[in-house]
Regions:
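Bacterial N-terminal signal peptides
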Residues: 7-16
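Terminal presequence/propeptide segments associated with secretion/organelle targeting
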Residues: 19-616
Length: 616
């Protein structure tokens, strides 16, 4: 009897060690060549809470050339009381599968609307190999051609079309209608959807941006996850992100939370392999990696999904590629801190603090979503509205980007306001300058439940013949929305270097002059460095004030992307000679002076032109 007790104790210890080895140490890997139909094993995934639970797996065969050339996936049937209730569910991606104690790979693919839980398994070798190869330092990027028409698009558009084009992806958000392959839905194997939880963001806001989100492969789920704090990183231990546990890829954290839920396939020391298919296929990344717990898995006839809540920050996701995502415990993610203060139309102030991933495509989009949510939480979206926006975008080693604008609309101005912040971010992040390091975004928005605008009707000037250096007075007449007329007095000094002859004086709002600038040679340029790009963005005119521009017909030039309106004939001849090429664009109309007027009581919209004559 004593020997039997000892034997059973040893067996229990060995069994415990065997199970622990799958989660805390490196299990032996099973090559794809050894996988045969009929083989049975088990998988691990979290169905509730944070503890991974077992389900059974039976190999049915392999598909060659799927999902990519020279690759194959294992087709298997999943069974067990938990899987039988939910089927293959969104968020299950990455669940490890073991046969004879060896790691085969990750549950990653499924057939939509299948009656049984039939899944595709990404072989673990593919997941490891793709992240072992090409782990090189990021190569310096060259500056891109930046257009002022892109910058000023914010004043005329409320759609994502005004921002740099988002890449289209069907990963995790494949449509079941309106697609050329719609008749074959259910007959094709697709990546298991990755549920992305939106916390603090109303459903109507998620709906407003659903098209943009689905284009890049995000399946939004609103208001079902728990928020995450801006707490510091928690040191990892042997129980952190073990195989089968739930992992969260955080895109926004703080008062707003946007995070994607998946499952850890393999942990090798501090290296984490998960998902088994791409999340957004973004390549090199630097996103927060957090622990995650599951509220429940919701059975759904279309696509079951898990409700998750992000937990402690434990590292960073550094790769998002064809066979999964890869992260490193202890690595610090690169985030952009945001402070957003909304002064409501009812004299209250709401402050939001959060962080957004630093990414050329995601940062502008997520900024729009979070800002729109903050405004929509307290302000109306139908009816006359004026939003006054101020703030800064802080860049390490550069001058701040100044935000100072107003937007008014009879049907809500929020989308115009959020674009005014997202647009400079998009241009900066897509400029190609490696030196760019966004240190923070600080924005104040003041809301008024009425329109505060007027239309510029006419100009008056006290004299039409002037001398160089002489002071004159102009008056700009504008009419506001209720029909009342008011006058803006504008003192003006004629430039001392004005040529004899006619001068054109233009008075207009920032948006009108920005649109006029689109036709000028200076509207498109390739900045030499980040500092020049920052100066160009800060030169953009604002909607909430008038500008006075004095112009003349004549000869000037743009030299090395800087406008030089007055150049002597000898210099123009040298620049235009056959011995000189590049960096030179002639100008037929030159701006002699330009003045920004202080903000007025109303937003004045429109543009008027008057001509004077300079005499001796």
């Amino acid at each position: 009897m004593k020997h039997l007790v000892i034997a059973l104790s040893i067996l229990a210890v060995l069994t415990s060690v065997s199970l622990a080895s799958e989660s805390t140490s490196n299990p032996e890997l099973m090559p794809l060549e050894q996988v045969r139909p009929g083989m049975k094993g088990h998988g691990m995934s979290v169905f509730q809470g944070s503890k991974a639970e077992r389900f059974e797996v039976e190999v049915l065969g392999t598909l060659e050339g799927v999902p990519n050339p020279k690759q194959s996936i294992v087709i298997a049937r999943l069974t067990g009381p938990l899987v039988d209730r939910t089927g293959v569910f969104a968020g299950m991606s990455g669940s490890p599968v073991y046969i004879d104690g060896k790691l085969v790979g990750a549950v990653a693919y499924a057939f939509p609307f299948a009656k049984e839980a039939i899944a595709g398994i990404t072989p673990i070798k593919y997941m490891i190999d793709i992240f072992e190869q090409g782990q090189k330092e990021e190569q310096p990027r060259s500056s891109q051609h930046v257009s002022f028409t892109t910058l000023i698009g914010q004043s005329a558009s409320t759609s994502i079309g005004s921002l740099p084009s988002l890449p289209s992806s069907q990963i995790g958000a494949r449509s079941t209608a309106g697609d050329a392959l719609a008749p074959y839905v259910g007959q094709t194997i697709v990546p298991i959807a990755t549920p992305v939880t939106f916390t603090g963001i109303p459903q109507n806001v998620v709906d407003a941006f659903a098209g943009d989100l689905r284009r890049i492969g995000i399946q939004p789920i609103a208001g079902v996850g728990g928020g995450s704090s801006l707490g510091p990183m928690v040191p990892a231990n042997e129980n952190t992100l073990t195989p089968g546990s739930s992992v969260s890829v955080q895109l926004v954290r703080g008062d707003f939370t946007i995070d994607a839920a998946g499952t850890v396939t393999h942990r090798d020391g501090g290296r984490i392999y998960a998902f088994g298919h791409p999340f957004l296929s973004s390549g090199a990344t630097n996103w927060p990696m957090a622990e995650s717990s599951i509220v429940t898995v919701v059975p759904n006839l279309n696509n079951s999904f898990k409700l998750s809540a992000a937990g402690n920050l434990v590292g960073a996701i550094s790769q998002d590629r064809a066979t999964g995502v890869y992260g490193q415990l202890g690595d610090k993610p690169r985030m952009v801190p945001v402070r957003l203060k909304v002064h409501t139309s009812r004299n209250k102030t709401e402050t939001y603090t959060f962080e957004i991933v630093s990414d050329p495509f995601l940062t502008p989009l997520l900024t729009r979503i979070t800002m729109f949510s903050a405004i929509a939480a307290t302000e109306r979206q139908i009816g006359s509205q004026t939003l006054k926006l101020s703030g800064t975008i802080t860049i390490d080693g550069q001058s701040d980007i100044k935000l100072d604008n107003s937007f008014t609309s009879p049907s809500g101005a929020a989308m115009f306001a959020v674009n005014a912040v997202a647009q400079p971010l998009a241009v900066l992040l897509n400029s190609g300058f490696n030196a760019l390091d966004l240190r923070g975004i600080d924005v104040d928005v003041t809301s008024i439940d009425s329109r505060s605008s007027g239309t510029l009707n006419r100009l008056w000037i006290d004299k039409t013949e002037v001398r160089r250096g002489e002071s004159i007075e102009m008056q700009a007449f504008a009419r506001n929305d209720n029909g009342s007329e008011f006058v803006e007095r504008i003192p003006l000094v004629i430039p001392a270097d004005s040529p004899i002859g006619p001068l054109v004086i233009i008075v207009g709002d920032g948006a009108s002059l920005n649109q006029a600038d689109r036709t000028q040679p200076s509207a498109e340029f390739s900045p030499r460095d980040l500092g020049q790009l920052v100066r160009a963005i800060n030169k953009l005119k604002r909607n909430n004030r008038l500008y006075v521009r004095v112009m003349r017909a004549g000869t000037g030039a743009i030299v090395n992307n800087e406008e030089m309106p007055v150049l002597p004939p000898s210099m123009l001849a040298t620049l235009g000679s056959s011995r000189t090429s590049g960096g030179y664009t002639p100008l037929s109309v030159a701006t002699l002076a330009e003045h920004e007027l202080p903000p007025s009581q109303f937003m004045i919209i429109g543009q008027q032109v008057i001509t004077i004559n300079v005499v001796k």
